[in-house]
Structures are given as structure tokens and as C-alpha cells.
Amino acid sequence: SEMCIRDRLKTVPEKLFANNKKVTTFNSLFANSESFESVPAGLFANNPEVDSFRMLFSGTSLKSVPDGLFANNHKVTNFQSAFSKTAIQSVPADLFAGCGKVTTFMSCFTGCSELQSVPAELFKSSGAFTTVTKTAFNNIFKDCTSLTEVPAGLFDGFTLVTAFNDAFNGCASLTTLPAGLFATNTAVTSFTNVFKGCTSLKS
């Protein structure tokens, strides 16, 4: 019966975790709850100690991301696969704002087949320039088959990153790229498969 409940869950009350101020991990919180489609903006507002949101909404039907979802989660280090394989079409520019301790965004938006665009400030607004690991952006937009463009400056300031492996692998709708997309990422040693399967790219 547990499976039945999980598969029908569409959303949760905003104050569900309001009194759980000591929570440090929400790993896989809604992962693979296929019916889950809406998250209240203040769901994590009273959880300032959270360190990891790994696979948070992975494999759900999440349609949109509310502004300020992580506004009070300044200690988070891990966003790996947090939104992977969801139905989101866009993300707010300030989604990671103030999350200055992030170590990885790896695979964060992998398989978001409905995602059409991303804001230029998405990662910069975190301020996590010195805390991200060398592979923090591997697979970041892998298989985002509806993504048509990448904004200039998306990765600006992340000077310690050494790899962007598979970052846009399978982005079949991507038609153009900004000239200086990796201009400030001077430590990079590997771009393996970064634009593999980007069949719409025009020179």
C-alpha cells in the first residue's frame, strides 16, 4: 500500500517540515514519486541546517520551481541530480542564490526533457566559486532535449572547475552557443562529450 500512496502524491503542505529545524539531509525526498508535480515555495524555509538535497525531486513530474525554494538553506553543499528527470520547463534565476557552500551541481538537471531555457545568473548567484569541486558541472544539462539556447556568462567565475564532461550531451535542440561560454573557466582540462549528440548546432 505504501507504493500506491507514493505514486499518487501530487504535492505536500508547505509547513510539513516547519518544526524540523535540525534536519541535515533531504536526499531523495520525493525521488521517483512519479505523480509529484508541485512543491510549495516555503517547504524548506525552516530547515537552515540542510547539507544535501541530492536527488531531491529526481524522477518526479515536477512542473515548475517556485522562487525562493532554497532561500534559507545557506549550508547546502550537494545539489547532485536534484531536479534530474523532472518535467520543469524553466528555473528561477535566484534558485541557488545565497547557497555559497555548494560543492556540486553535477547532473542537477540531467534528463529534464521539457527544460527550454536557463537564466544566465543561475549558478553565479550562488556565490559558490571557491567551494565547488572540479567536476561540479559534469552532466549538468545532459539529455535536456528541449533546451534551445545557453545564455552568455552561465559559468562565469568558476575558475577552479576542471571538467565539463557531458555537460550538454544529448541536447538535440541546441542551435547556438555564446562565444565566451567557457572564457573564465581557465583550469578546465576535459570537455569530454560536452556537445555529443547536439545535432542541431549550427556553425
Language-model features: locations:
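Short, small-residue-biased leader/transition segments that mark boundaries at the very start
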Residues: 1-5
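Core hydrophobic positions of leucine-rich repeats
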Residues: 6-8, 13-17, 24-34, 40, ...
